[in-house]
Amino acid sequence: MKTLNTFFLIMFAVCFLSSKSYASTACAATSTAASHQGLSGSANYATNGDDGYCFHTPTSMKVTVYEFGLCTAASSPTSKTACTTIFNNTSGKTLDLGVGSSLPLSDSVSLTEGTYTHAYVVLSNVTSIKSVIQFSTARVDDTNNSGTYCYTDGRSVNDTPKPKSVMSCGSNGSNAAYAVETIGLGGNTYSNTYINYTVSMGGVNIVSNLYAITSSGALSSAGNDFALYGSQQLASAVNITPDTKGLDIAFSITDGVTLGFGINLGNGVAVGQTGPNDAVFEGLRFKITAR
């Protein structure tokens, strides 16, 4: 066993210029509903089962983390034998990824020397997203306000009745507020498992196995989701050797949200809205290096 000093940084990467987006998948100053249509099923497809979405780096994302670990193979809620848990808190720790906050990890962690290809996280299925995007020309929101800035305004897709939009537009983004979202895996049909969920974040394809679980850690059924268990293949494997002194562990939210244009959130689409009307959590990228 190798005892390491562990540094955990929740990293917010402002990375618009270095994001190697694919054709028509990244949100841009000129984006419209037409810019992100017709991509479904193609290699350049932006996101989550519907046309009309583009990748975006949010201003801030709040998540609650219950557990985090490093693994030598893919894991699941019922099979973590390949993993070493680095953080565990049954009450959870809420992190503001846009500001940069840290998990209270132990001073050291023991890892068996070898190659770690995966990591896992258990996080609440309720997230909060704050996003602001600036366009080159004025856009109109669902209440006929207009401006070159569009932003999440505090409404949620979980509201009753359903809103037509969770975003407003104006002359600046100072009124941006968090949009709360309860994450599901199955779209219109409930599912507690999503294998090989793939999303491009910062130009890197991130592959994860996702599971909806109960508070006891078992796979959930419709209506009793408590958290998400995500097993993610690392973009670069972590090698623990006799010379390894510690670990640097980070989350990146670059391209971690998608914005949608002309999306029916359950109450129709507002006539004349030219700005985005939806903001959706897409994922986190684990960035782990040995030193």
Model feature map: region roles:
Residues M1-F8:
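Bacterial N-terminal signal peptides that target proteins for export
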Residues F8-F16:
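Bacterial N-terminal signal peptides
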Residues L17-A23:
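Sec/Tat signal peptide C-region and signal peptidase I cleavage site
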Residues S24-R291:
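A short, solvent-exposed, low-complexity linear motif enriched for acidic/polar residues
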